[in-house]
Amino acid sequence: MSELSIYLDFRAQPGEPPTATDYDDGVRLVQAAERLGFAHVWTTEQHGVDDGYLPAQLPMLAALARETSTIRLGTAVILLPLTHPRRVVEEACVVDVLSHGRLTLGLGAGNYPNEFRIFGADPSGRRQAMDEGVPFIKAGLSGGILPDGSPVNVPPVQQPIPLVLGGLLRGPAGRAARLADGHFAYSYLDPELELARFYRETLRPSLERHGRGPEFRLIFASVIWASDHAEREWRETVGPAFIYQQRKYAEWEAGMPSAGGYAFSGDVDDLRKRLLIGRPAQIADRLLGLREAYPFCEIVVWARLPGVPAELALAHLETLAGEVAPALADRPAP
């Protein structure tokens, strides 16, 4: 069985910071996802940008913890080189207590130059920050004594809080296989090809080398749109929103080696052919085919891209829950 989850950055309109009403709409989407049986709400972060991309994941998840009761709450991912590992542990444990044990902590290295500049961090130190920070944090996720000899102020409910790591290169994949409970991947354009290649060439060898079995969670995020009116909705609303999202990523990534395939070309109709866009039955079949090559246990769907009305995003969640999720549940994972 594969679970469906949602991904949110809490942007509502292209180029505009969110209002309190926009945040309220985001909370309602999460509550709807919980009611519809989605497994997780995952958040993400960026810093120093002009369009309201969420900069503070754990505070947001603390708020969502009090507005929900069953859906799990995940960070995908906290940019560890930009913060102190102790602060991550302490805030994560508080969220786990507030949520009665529903947090999954996702960590990553980041790669956008401006974020490192505004935090006074050296991008060349990302690997060291992860190599030192991840074991420190992992030691605290059960609420015990940290490697510096000091206690965690507030022990978590879960023993331990689950830990996942992101990153599509060999080093991050190996670190996840060695230290984490799972790996968080993302793939937008040509996901069937890209994820199969990543698993075959990078992740599976790391998992085999470290003796990881079926308990290791493979999670991936993508832009998916399942609708009986998929072509029209893509052309009029979802496609322009996706292009805005990807252009902002490319803008932020300028000057850095590609770490996830953000560069793209073509118009809205050309791009549609490279994404998981189609009728619900078509999307279910494609996801089942992808699972043969990339044995994921959880699919994370962008719940609302900037510019997609909240009502349309909600209707899409209902379609996913009613027509795509049952097909994934009916056929066991390989």
Range-by-range predicted roles:
Residues 1-73, 161:
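N-terminal beta1-alpha1-beta2 module of alpha/beta enzyme domains
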Residues 2, 84-182, 186-215, 257:
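Internal, glycine-rich beta/alpha segment that forms the wall or movable "lid"
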Residues 4-8, 41-43, 73-75, 103-107, ...:
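Hydrophobic faces of well-ordered beta-strands that scaffold small-molecule active sites
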Residues 8-23, 78-86, 158-168, 271-279:
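Active-site mouth loops of central-metabolism enzymes
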Residues 20-32, 91, 167-175, 282-289:
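Short, acidic/polar
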Residues 37, 45, 64, 95, ...:
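Conserved, mostly hydrophobic/aromatic
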Residues 40-64, 79, 111, 187-191, ...:
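Glycine-rich, proline-tolerant flexible connector loops at the mouths of alpha/beta enzymes
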Residues 119, 123-153, 193-297, 329-334:
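An alpha-helical appendage that flanks or caps ligand/catalytic pockets
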